[in-house]
């Protein structure tokens, strides 16, 4: 998280740290007593046995509870080149349970109305400056940052200028024309909260999530 501040798992008990070969590389969010939602580009092509997730801890690399996985379900229409439909469900091999620091998140439904310029919060354990490598991740305390939703047409035109396509399945956020706040390497797959509800792209996938989680 760039431009944010330290937070705690008590403030965001649905956060999950995704571990590849026991090393934090992505974020996720608890959605029920067995599943974590993340981005498909995180586990795509990997063996299920290479992944675990940690819940209930402010620290990405210690504390809380670590779960092995029974399966990883990537969205069937995920496109690894355009990152369209970039969503995945990691199912734990055992029940996650709940506590003050472990809670499933509420997920925006298909009728959730998220306007432009709305305050949203991104959370994660990733790099705190642009260009931070995996080896330099702070990996200590969870961080959060306040950003804002960006108009879809504005976002699409900005990305088109650098040869990237923004689809209707994507949600844009940041600090438009100011910058300095955002998610970064290692935050991929983590939640974007609007009034404590996970929004990001999930409102377009609610039925798929419910069917597979």
From Swiss-Prot:
Enzyme class: hydrolase
Regulation: Sensitive to serine proteinase inhibitors and thiol proteinase inhibitors.
Enzyme Commission numbers on file: 3.4.21.-
Subcellular location, principal: secreted
GO cellular component, one term: extracellular region
Residues in Peptidase S1 domain copies: 1-213
Localization in the cell: Secreted, Extracellular space
SS bonds (residue pairs): 26-42, 155-172
MF terms (GO), sorted A to Z: serine-type endopeptidase activity; toxin activity
Annotated catalytic residues: 41, 86, 188
Tissue expr: Hemolymph and saliva of the larval form (caterpillar).
Protein keywords: Disulfide bond, Fibrinolytic toxin, Hemostasis impairing toxin, Hydrolase, Protease, Secreted, Serine protease, Toxin
Coiled coil: none
Example GO biological process: proteolysis
Record family assignment: Belongs to the peptidase S1 family.
PANTHER family, alphabetized: FI18310P1-RELATED (PTHR24276:SF98), POLYSERASE-RELATED (PTHR24276)
Function (record text): Fibrinolytic activity; shows preferential cleavage of Arg-Gly bonds in all three fibrinogen chains. Contact with the caterpillars causes severe bleeding, due the anticoagulant effect of the protein.
Protein name, entry field: Achelase-1
């Amino acid at each position: 998280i760039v431009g944010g501040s330290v937070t705690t798992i008590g403030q965001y008990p649905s956060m999950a740290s995704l571990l590849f070969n026991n090393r934090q590389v992505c974020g996720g969010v608890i959605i029920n007593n067995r599943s974590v939602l993340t981005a498909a580009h995180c586990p795509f092509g990997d063996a299920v046995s290479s992944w675990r997730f940690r819940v209930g801890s402010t620290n990405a690399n210690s504390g809380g509870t670590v779960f092995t996985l029974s399966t990883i379900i990537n969205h069937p229409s995920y496109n690894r080149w355009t990152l369209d439909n970039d969503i995945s469900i990691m199912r734990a091999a055992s029940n996650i349970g709940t506590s003050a620091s472990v809670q499933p998140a509420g997920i925006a439904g298909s009728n959730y109305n998220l306007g432009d310029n709305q305050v949203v919060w991104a959370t994660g354990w990733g790099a705190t400056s642009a260009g931070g490598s995996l080896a330099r991740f702070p990996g200590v305390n969870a961080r959060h940052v306040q950003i804002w939703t960006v108009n879809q047409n504005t976002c699409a035109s900005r990305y088109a200028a650098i040869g990237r396509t923004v689809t209707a399945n994507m949600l844009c956020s940041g600090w438009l024309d100011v910058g300095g706040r955002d998610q970064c390497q290692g935050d991929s797959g983590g939640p974007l909260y609007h009034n404590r509800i996970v929004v990001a792209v999930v409102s377009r996938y609610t039925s798929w999530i419910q069917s597979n989680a």
